[in-house]
Amino acid sequence: MKNFKGTFTALVTPFKNGKIDFASLDKLLKQQLAGGVDGFVVNGTTGESPVLTSSEKAELFKHIRNVCGDKVVLIMGTGSNNTAQTIEDSRKAEEMGADAILVVVPYYNKPPQRGLYEHFKAVASSVKIPTILYNVPGRTITSLETGTIRDLAKVKGVVGIKEATGKIDLASEIIKACGSEFVMLSGDDGTYVEFLGVGGHGVISVASHVIPAQMVQWKKWVSEGALDKARADIAKYNDLINLLFVEANPIPVKKALQLMGILESAELRLPLVELGAENTAKLQAEMKKVGVL
């Protein structure tokens, strides 16, 4: 099994004139590999998965695998609020060569904890590759409770969770309930260093598009016992991280990547639209302040 304890970028999907912009994607992948990230999540929230067709998802994954080879871990987002569809997409991800699947809590349906357990158990049982749970109640409304996560950690194939509430007490509670072998990945960039401080293993990040080397370094410092050093360094980037979420992700990060000259366009697909002028000015000023422009 691949190592899922590391720094993973939740990749944007670059667009140009309504199509996937593979030239910009290649520039982004080159920058990310140079920054030392351990892998990528493809077809996640940041990748605008709801507006990609099945063929686009497959084309995107295959292109990234061809460019990166086995140098990085590739995790495919396959979650939906339809268990049968999630199973179908998870099997496709396995066939394409994904190292793991990332499965979000079903949204809109508002299932009870019993339903969540059965959903994730059914998905994990349908494939041989590892399953990573994804808890993000800010988008799904429904949240996985610690007891449910503990029970799912015992299901064959369920290896970890992307915990995106930003609640450090909750992260600590899950770690105690599930043990150190259960992979804990932060889904909240602003609290990442504190997450590592209570025993977290890594991150699935948006900010790593812009500051990949720094995100990698923070984990290294914490693993070496230099938590305060990591805390002091992330403090320099707090305003930047906040601005990367000033509008719905991935709106700001696409603009940031365009400003950096990595993406040709900050184009998104409706219903998302490009970052407003006022917030663009704030983002650009902060990027210059911290030295990424």
Swiss-Prot record:
Function: Catalyzes the condensation of (S)-aspartate-beta-semialdehyde [(S)-ASA] and pyruvate to 4-hydroxy-tetrahydrodipicolinate (HTPA).
Binding site for pyruvate: T46, I204
Record-linked Pfam families: DHDPS (PF00701)
Naturally occurring in which organism (per UniProt): Bdellovibrio bacteriovorus (strain ATCC 15356 / DSM 50701 / NCIMB 9529 / HD100)
Stated name of the protein: 4-hydroxy-tetrahydrodipicolinate synthase
Enzyme class name: lyase
Homology family: Belongs to the DapA family.
SUPFAM superfamilies: Aldolase
Coiled coil feature spans: none
Protein's cellular compartments: Cytoplasm
